Amino acid sequence: MYQEYPPCQLLAPYIDKYWEFKGETEYDMRYKILPDGCTDFIFSIEEPSQPLNGEMLMQPYRFYFVGPMRVYSELVTRSIRLHMMGVRFSPCGLAAFARMPLGEFTDTRVNASELNVLFDDHFAEMLCEKESLQERIHIIDRHLIARLPGLQPVDPQIIRATDLIVQANGMLPIQQLTDKLYIGQRHFERKFKHITGYTPKEFSRITKFRYATRVLRQMKGEDMQQLAIDCGYYDPSHFIKEFRKLSGSPPSAFMALPIPEDDPLTYIE
């Protein structure tokens, strides 16, 4: 049902992946989506679906923007079939294409036609009319590559900061991070949030959580105490509390759920 596709080489610095969610489902089925430090444009190709809080119904042939999410969200199907495609931008990727203050879109989903950024309704309709995912990816590639010559460079310190945080699995103290970058912490935090939508601490927290989900999926009876320490948490209770807050489930329930091997960030409850 869920598949991921890498971007072309020219767009790899900006796009984390393309993804497609397609298949038969059940009415009112819940899909939990975990925070990943990225932002998405989602094209709804067939039947409607709706976030659990009911803030909007995602209609076919429309597109939506999902801002930087700090905790899990839930999507509820409103049909027996689900088909959508997403363009997932890397933490600093969207800032190169659109000078929008991502800090104002944290934990939000909006009808993307209201933003007037990158895509429009005509583009979304044309994309959804195509028969195959490969055609859709080709159209998006061509659309974004045409904009590469006009891109404004993203602050290299912030790009470097996100790279360092990811390399450290979210366990690099912010003071050490700013020391490595030779930048004042307050100024750094403002720039980081403007470009990524997160504070450095929030982004580190999500990166650590993502690392913990990968480790947890590979566990086979290992000691939870050691797991918590290896993933940068004080103790098992701290780990369980953080995991529950970001995923909506304790680690034990997460391990028991049917999670697709290629998608640790989306699962059915």
Predicted stretch roles:
Residues 163, 210-214, 241:
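Contiguous, well-ordered alpha-helical segments that form the cores/surfaces of helical PPI scaffolds
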